[in-house]
């Protein structure tokens, strides 16, 4: 299997009143079927990088695992598109209907699944982190400058975790949920505590993205785009600071503004 996140392909382009042949970068879509204790759990459409992190983060987001010690083994067979996961426990009855679900790269889950499972295991943030406006603007600038494949293709979501100064991890994926799951998996693998960390994200803060941030455990989420009304409601309920429209030296704070302090004070 070719593990390139993007590939050059021939296209016909129209520009300045003319049609001409050229090449363009396409992002790669890769179906990964996750097998848990020998049973098919889900198929995720993703970018073919950091797949072990993706699998671990995805299982944690689904509530199938709570910590690294519950994993017995994770074997990635990227030539066939399978991830074989062994757990030190049974999944239980609540995951029976999850079998053979397809998680598309561009779409969230159904509203029913989201409310029954996702919201139930989201954590209320106890984060005590504070940030200055300059830190917020600098982190978003750094995320965008690090996203060279997005600049080439326009087709990937980017996300990072930071303490306000240092990026601990930066990941990209064709699916916005996958990008966050890769961060989550990275932190679980390395036992990184994220309570006083920041999630920086390139996409819109939807309710599902906000729930994902709550599962990861961060207290602040930053985005260059706007949140939805339900995302802001959830952010207030879960004690998460949501900051959006970070661009041109400004931003909007939608929930829990007490974590953002004036650098002039």
From Swiss-Prot:
Pfam families: FdhD-NarQ. It is found in: Cytoplasm. The active site is at residue 107. GO terms for molecular function: sulfur carrier activity; sulfurtransferase activity. One of its GO terms (cellular component) is cytoplasm. Keywords: Cytoplasm, Molybdenum cofactor biosynthesis. SUPFAM superfamilies: Cytidine deaminase-like. GO terms for biological process: Mo-molybdopterin cofactor biosynthetic process. PANTHER family: FORMATE DEHYDROGENASE, SULFUR CARRIER PROTEIN FDHD. HAMAP family: FdhD. Required for formate dehydrogenase (FDH) activity. Acts as a sulfur carrier protein that transfers sulfur from IscS to the molybdenum cofactor prior to its insertion into FDH. Belongs to the FdhD family. This is Sulfur carrier protein FdhD. It comes from Staphylococcus aureus (strain bovine RF122 / ET3-1).
């Amino acid at each position: 299997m070719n593990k390139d996140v993007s590939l050059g392909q021939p296209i016909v382009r129209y520009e300045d009143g003319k049609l001409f042949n050229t090449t363009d970068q396409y992002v790669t879509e890769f179906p990964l079927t996750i097998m848990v204790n020998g049973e098919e759990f889900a198929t995720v459409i993703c970018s073919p990088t950091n797949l072990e992190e993706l699998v671990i983060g995805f299982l944690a987001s689904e509530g199938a695992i709570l910590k690294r010690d519950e994993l017995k083994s994770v074997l990635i067979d990227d030539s066939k598109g399978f991830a074989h996961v062994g757990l030190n426990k049974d999944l239980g009855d609540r995951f029976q209907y999850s079998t053979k679900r397809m998680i598309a790269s561009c779409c969230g889950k159904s509203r029913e699944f989201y409310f029954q499972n996702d919201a139930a295991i989201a954590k209320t943030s106890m984060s005590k982190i504070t940030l200055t406006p300059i830190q917020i603007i600098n982190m978003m600038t750094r995320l965008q400058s690090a996203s060279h494949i997005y600049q080439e293709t326009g087709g990937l979501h980017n996300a990072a975790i930071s303490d306000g100064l240092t990026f601990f991890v930066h990941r990209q994926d064709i699916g916005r949920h996958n990008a966050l799951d890769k961060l989550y998996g990275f932190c679980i693998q390395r036992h990184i505590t994220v309570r006083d960390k920041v999630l920086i994200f390139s996409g819109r803060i939807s309710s599902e993205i906000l729930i994902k941030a709550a599962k990861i455990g961060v207290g602040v989420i930053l985005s260059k785009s706007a949140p939805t009304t339900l995302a802001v409601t959830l952010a207030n309920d879960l004690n998460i600071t949501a900051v959006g429209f970070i661009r041109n030296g400004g931003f909007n704070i939608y929930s829990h503004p007490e974590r953002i302090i004036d650098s002039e004070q």
